[in-house]
Amino acid sequence: DWAIGKFLEEFQQHPKFEDTVFIITADHAMAHFQSNEPYERFRIPLFIYSPKHVEPGISENYGSQIDLLTTIVDLLQLEGTYSSIGSNLLEEKPNYAVVKEGALINIFSPLGFLQHSLGQIVHYQPGENQPSEQDRQHLEEQVLAFDHLTYLLLTSNRWQRL
């Protein structure tokens, strides 16, 4: 943490500082694999720093690494076509994250956590609300729709921005 702060402090003197976006994250949460708590196993930090472009704050929204490309492209206001199924993490969006874990696909949202084998539900953990069959069913529909859409786009080579 200290080294990152020192680097940013020194880089403020660079002429390109105002037009630079710093993105710091991890590619996995290795230390958390010992936990049985899914929210802890998959939680990784994401730090986006660009005083000219990003308002300071902390987001409690769910997101995953598939959202990084869309976030960066939108933040940099890049022109042209690109392929992504992610959402911009800096905008209001459906509050969920989909994470693959080997052959399993997981979805996190305020409604809860659901792990699916694409044949059946492997694990369901309700969110902050009282557990409901409707919430579980909604999460299952979301994760299956996400997987189906990804499959269709890949097999037909028809990626599009959603």
Question: Predicted segment positions?
Answer:
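Solvent-exposed soluble domains appended to multi-pass membrane proteins
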Residues: D1-L162
